[in-house]
Amino acid sequence: MQDLFLAKVESAMQASQVGALAGQTATVSSVSATTNLATITPTTAGQAPIIVKLDAARQVTELQALMGKTVLVGKTPTTIGGIGNWIALTPAAGAKTGAAVAGTGQLVMMKVEGTGAAIKLPALAGKSFIVAQPPVAAGTKAAGMLYLNPVGGGDMVAINIQNAMTQTGGLVGKTFTVAPSPVIGGTTGKFLVLKPMATGVGKAVGSGAVVAKFVPAAVTGTGGAAAIGAGSATTLMATGASTITPVTAAAAGSAMLTAKGVGLGLGLGLGAWGPFALGAIGLAGVVALYTWARRRHGAPDVSDDALLAAVGEE
């Protein structure tokens, strides 16, 4: 039996009436193949039945399989791109409690554009992603794409979404699990359904950035930082999408992590992490860090002028 039933209904009023029961149980009392009308009756005494009109014959058939059964009513899904009004029902057998359903976030639904995008959906179902900021060049507009970074690592997934440019910005930095796509007509679902995760690898902060986890380099017996090779499992930052080490980043042509930057880091006694320190705390901070390290090991101080002169020669 399916875990989640999503149905497109005739009007926003019908969707809101069903959504008002979120977290409660109800019974699918009747489903008519002639009129496409379905009756959903709350199990709580004193509440009136709700009648909705389903959009497609296929959904009538699917809901008929739940007739006479108890379902948990979910919140009205948030829809993007003018894709109509939807309701969410979950078969009660083996499902979460009503309180848990009421406490979860709303589903987010959007329609994909093109056969290629629709074909991707089944493979994404059940997997978790962090919505990424569109990689847009300066002076250009974002294409109608939604970018998803797999939680735990992997290649970024780009999906063509209807009206994605203007309505998906609020999703950036948030973590979702992809739910199975409802099929309205034909045999392929054309709707991307995102289910908010209660807890994720990252948490949205500020403008939607994902909190990065810092993993320090291993410390050697001499007090220095052990070199981390390109193939090491240890990473500087882990956002669920990519791994970065100072050497591999420099090899990739980063403006900050050039050979000069690596050489400067080695000269300051910071090893290959020197360029990252320069980018994070600036030259003045590196000077202070270098002075502290020398004092800790009993080495004589070096004047600021001498150190800055050495930097200028790099």
UniProtKB/Swiss-Prot annotation:
Annotated region (GL repeat), positions in chain: 263-270
Keywords linked to the UniProt accession: Biomineralization, Iron, Magnetosome, Membrane, Metal-binding, Transmembrane, Transmembrane helix
Entry keyword Transmembrane: yes
Subcellular location(s) per record: Magnetosome membrane
Post-translational modification, as annotated: Seen in gels as a band of about 7 kDa, suggesting it may undergo cleavage.
GO molecular function list: metal ion binding
Full protein name: Magnetosome protein MamD
NCBIfam families from the UniProt entry: MamD (NF040916)
Additional facts recorded: This bacteria makes up to 60 cubo-octahedral magnetosomes of about 45 nm in diameter which contain membrane-bound crystals of magnetite (Fe(3)O(4)).
Single GO cellular component term: magnetosome membrane
Residue spans crossing the bilayer: 268-288
Functional description taken from the UniProt entry: Helps regulate magnetite crystal morphology, probably in a single growth axis. Plays a role in regulating magnetite crystal size. Probably binds Fe(2+).
Protein's UniProt keywords contain Metal-binding: yes
Domain statement: The isolated charged lumenal magnetite-interacting component (MIC, residues 298-314) binds Fe(2+).
Designated gene of the protein: mamD
Protein's membrane topology: Single-pass membrane protein
Family annotation (InterPro entries): Magnetosome_regulatory
Membrane side Cytoplasmic: residue ranges: 1-267
Natural source organism: Magnetospirillum gryphiswaldense (strain DSM 6361 / JCM 21280 / NBRC 15271 / MSR-1)
Lineage: Bacteria, Pseudomonadati, Pseudomonadota, Alphaproteobacteria, Rhodospirillales
Segments on the Lumenal face: 289-314
